[in-house]
Amino acid sequence: MTDAVGSIDMPDAQDEAPDSKKSRKGGKRGKKGPLKRLALFYRQIVAELRKVVWPSRNQLTTYTTVVIIFVVIMIGLVTLIDYGFSHAAKYVFG
């Protein structure tokens, strides 16, 4: 097909995609009801939680102590920065 100035380009027959409807895969998943899918979901949750490596009591105590100490240090740091900014603002603005 030759394109002239001002002509309308029409798509060729081989350019068009075939009309294909997406078919749903029936299989086992498509036929389960909502309660069975919910039960499967909870079974999968339990199966995944069994794979988790839980910390021992000693490790848990250590991790908790480290987190609490870190939080206390961060609270102190933010308090000091806030105290410094408030005194600087009082000095500048009276």
From Swiss-Prot:
Its job: Essential subunit of the Sec protein translocation channel SecYEG. Clamps together the 2 halves of SecY. May contact the channel plug during translocation.
Biased amino acid composition, Basic residues: 22-32
Protein name listed in UniProt: Protein translocase subunit SecE
Subunit comment: Component of the Sec protein translocase complex. Heterotrimer consisting of SecY, SecE and SecG subunits. The heterotrimers can form oligomers, although 1 heterotrimer is thought to be able to translocate proteins. Interacts with the ribosome. Interacts with SecDF, and other proteins may be involved. Interacts with SecA.
GO biological process: intracellular protein transmembrane transport; protein secretion; protein targeting; protein transport by the Sec complex
Family (UniProt): Belongs to the SecE/SEC61-gamma family.
Keywords, ordered alphabetically: Cell membrane, Membrane, Protein transport, Translocation, Transmembrane, Transmembrane helix, Transport
Membrane disposition: Single-pass membrane protein
Cellular localisation: Cell membrane
Organism: Streptomyces coelicolor (strain ATCC BAA-471 / A3(2) / M145)
GO CC, one annotated term: plasma membrane
Xref: HAMAP family: SecE (MF_00422)
Region (Disordered): 1-32
Chief site of localization: membrane
Gene3D superfamilies for the chain: Preprotein translocase secy subunit (1.20.5.1030)
GO molecular function, a single term: protein transmembrane transporter activity
Transmembrane segments: 65-85
